[in-house]
Every structure is written in C-alpha cells, then in structure tokens.
Amino acid sequence: QPENLPPQLPFFLFIYPEFRLRGGWKGTAELLRADFEEKIQVVHKKDLKNRADYARITTLYTSLVLRARQPGDRFRPAGRGLSKPLRKWMNEAGVPNELRDTLPLLASGSEILWVCGEGFADGLAPDTESRWILHLDAEIETQEEKTNEYAR
C-alpha cells in the first residue's frame, strides 16, 4: 500500500469529498440538506453518529484537518458530558492497538471532533435548527478496491 500520503489533510469539503489517509483508509465527506424529507427518512444508526451540524462545526472550529492521533489529543464522546484524553478513550472503547495510530479523525488543534467508528463529539449532533448536515465516513480499503483503483 502506498504510504506516501500526507500525515494530515486540511479539511475542505468541496475540494476533498473523498479522501485517503495513511493505513489504507478511504473516506467520504458529504454535505446534506437538512430538509423535511431527510428528517423522516429511515436512517441507519451508524449514519446518525457520523452526522453533525455543519454550521456549528465551521462556526466554532477553525483549521479543521483529517489526520490520525497525536500526543495531547482530547475527545468528548457524545452523551458523556466530559472530555478525556483520546488515548484513554481508545483504551476504554477497546479500539484495537493496530488501528490506533491510523484511525481517521477530524480535528481542530488537539480537540477531536470526529472519530471513525465512534462518530462526532458531544454537542455537534444535528437538531431541528440544523440547515446543513456534515456526513463523514471511512473504512479500510480492501485489496480488491486498491487493484480496481489502479487499473483505471
């Protein structure tokens, strides 16, 4: 697998709707309109935790980057009402050791706003006032997907 990818990517939704990060991760970022139809659709629980109020994120946080963990990172898990070191959260959540150094994160400085597989931090979920919803998702690219990508 090519590891010549940058250690982090500036998060510009309209420039990078699809992204690749070290460790074989491939992801997507979408901006969804929060209209009536969106709210009444049956949405998978996994998708809900990967959605956040776009205006809230872009108003409260600057210099967003997609990256892996760094020393000093902190995360506020949704519904827990507290912030804790990302390292400690990963231990408690049972994140496999082999994924911890490459797991995709959306960060602003040392504050982690989204963790792949866990979702967005506390206070970022869309609500009835949300007009635009950010949807992030990522997974490890399979060997077959890599082969198909390079064959194009």
Where are these regions (language model features)?
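AMP-forming adenylation/ATP pyrophosphatase catalytic core
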Residues: 1-152
